[in-house]
């Protein structure tokens, strides 16, 4: 039996679930009411926004981790969009002084941020996922980062930082050069497959079939398109080019042929070594580079199953060959990353924004998390403030529905890593405050078993949005928390789980705050313990209401029922 429960002072009033047609009718009326309420509140928020400063200000000092009020969290970092008073009201709308950001932030760890102090500060400023870029560094340095992140998670049990290992992939790169080579427009410049060659007009490449893969007239893009050359001729071991757009060629720069992909395996021998390293160190996610088809994902997942490794696979969409296979690639994966750098090098650059929107939409429809990456705050590698275009780029990704946004060089080797995270947090938070909270009923074409779960997630979201309550979900697998995230409730989803690996994975999903807690055989004890945790952590207050959701084959409520929704008042 399925039931909705609404309770006051812990005395539930139960309403049994009605037939689907009636449920949909009920949900429509609730949605209409919620839409009207949202319209008024949106107008009020616009008035508040007009009073807020739009100038992003940064301070050189690092966040104080020893605040008298306890450890600093990313919610306590002052932002330019914050109201001057702690709590304010406008009409009937209560303005929260300490809202929680729902879009997650992935930070690449590198020389600028690999110390214990900086990893702590990144986490407190807003980092949700630490990314290890296997194109740089060695296993020893990455092991140090993994250990530091795990130390942080152990020290702050209410905080969760996941670890993502990003494979190098089948990249074609130029060789090492003693000093940067200045390429000038019209200049002749050569690439050779002979190793160790470096001169003013010739440099080596790391790919033996490079000469076979390129043709006369092909456009070569260097370093993500920062420089471009046209192929004029080729011989047995040399490709002769003419510079179209010049620039500074440094060591190991990435090479692309516009409209083509190299005939290399998606997972190289080095990648397999790095993947085994990830298994041994229990990372949470793999980000697999240059995935061209679903077979690559199946091969990796088969390997992980053989190892007994519970690691999710994020596919990086960055190859021209992947575009015709998008649906099957995303379906086979556990999520996707829009890697716009190489995508924009292999395809016409004007296609990238449209592909970004399409990939986000596809992931959302399949309930897979999606990360938007590359050049989001590129100027902040060297400058303390972002360009206005970069701010808009973050806002667009948030509005399109990305689960996470990613920083690469900004935090790996940039001069202002903490400021970059703070800007990303601030812009995402401000953008989220302007988004609609309307929900759409799940399609009737969904199989019945999964349809029941999506229906309850839809109704729970509608109820939480209408009553303006956060959601508490109890989950052993993470499935219901993920489904709730798909409907984008206006408040936080507190996902309580008794599985550490599930807690780590859920941190990537939009709006989900995972919390580890052992479940009791006594349902009321489990509820009370969860509410007590939230109150003690300052995440909820006495007198507030919360929507409780539980769904699954092993419910913590009644044995005969697998789906429940309750609304409860938090007691002191």
Residue ranges of model-derived segments:
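Non-catalytic helical/linker scaffolds that mediate oligomerization, partner binding
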Residues: 2-572
